Amino acid sequence: MAVLMQVFSHLDDISLWSASKVCKRWQQLVAECITNDQWNQFTFRRWPLFRPNYAVAEWAGVFANLVDSSPCLYCLHRSNVEEEGAWEPSNHWRNNRLCNEWRIFCTDPPEGIRATPLDRAWSHWQASITGPTSSPYEGGVFYLHVQIPHSYPIRPPSVRFATKIFHPNISRHGDIGLDCIQHNWSLALTIAKVLISVQSLLTDPFCAVAMEADVAEMYINKRARFNAVARNWTSKYAMNDIRRPC
C-alpha cells in the first residue's frame, strides 16, 4: 500500500482519476491520498470557466463528472499542456490581437459565450457556449477547446467541443464541421465570431454536409427522436453546473 501511495503522489489529475477507476481499493487509496481542496484545484485548472450553481461538498465527484463528459480523454489530457518553446513573445501582431480579443471577452462577451486562455503562449484557450433557448441544448453549458496557431490570425484556430454533444455537424470526437475555420478563414474573423458561428449551429444544423451522417438523417427524417436524444445528451453531459455527483 505504501508503494502505491508513493506512486499516486506523483500522478497528474487525469492519471489519478484513471487510477481511481481501476478497482474499489485503488479508489479508496486515491481518496486517502488526494484532498478535497486538491480536487477543487484540479477541477478549475482543467475547467477554469466552470461555475457550479450549488454548494459543492465533494470535488472529486465533480471532476469525475466533467471528465466523463469529455469526448476524448487524450485531448483533455493535452488541452492545457504548454508546448515546449511556445513562450516566445516575438509575434507581436498575434499577441496584441489575442490580448485585445481576450479583453473584449472580459468586458463585453457575446451572449452565452465565454473564453479564457489556458497558457502563457495564448496557444490553448477554453471556451463555453450556453445552449440556445428553444433548442434541445437549452440549459446546457458546453466547453470547447480552442488551439491558436503561432501564425494566427493568418491561419485559423482549431476549435473542437470538449463536452459530448449530439449534433449532425459535430463528430463523436468533438470536431466541428464549420466552413469559416476549414475553408473560408478571413483576417476579419476573430475567436468570438467563430464561437458565435458554432453557437448558431446549435439552432440551425447544416445537414447537407454532416460530420455524423446518421445524426443528420435522424434530424431530417425523425426530428422528434433527434430532439429527445440531443436533450438526453445535454442533460447527461452538459449540466454539470447543476448536476450533483452521485
Where are these regions (language model features)?
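Short, solvent-exposed beta-strand/turn "edge" segments of beta-rich domains on protein surfaces
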Residues: 116-119, 131-138
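Domain-scale recognition of soluble eukaryotic interaction modules
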Residues: 69-109, 128, 139-141, 156-246
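Skp1-binding F-box subdomain of Cullin-RING ligase substrate receptors
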Residues: 1-96
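Short, charged/polar surface micro-motifs in flexible loops or helix N-caps
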Residues: 132-134, 148-154
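Active-site-proximal segments of catalytic enzyme domains
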Residues: 114-117, 157
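Short, hydrophobic/aromatic-rich segments at coil-to-beta transitions
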Residues: 121-126
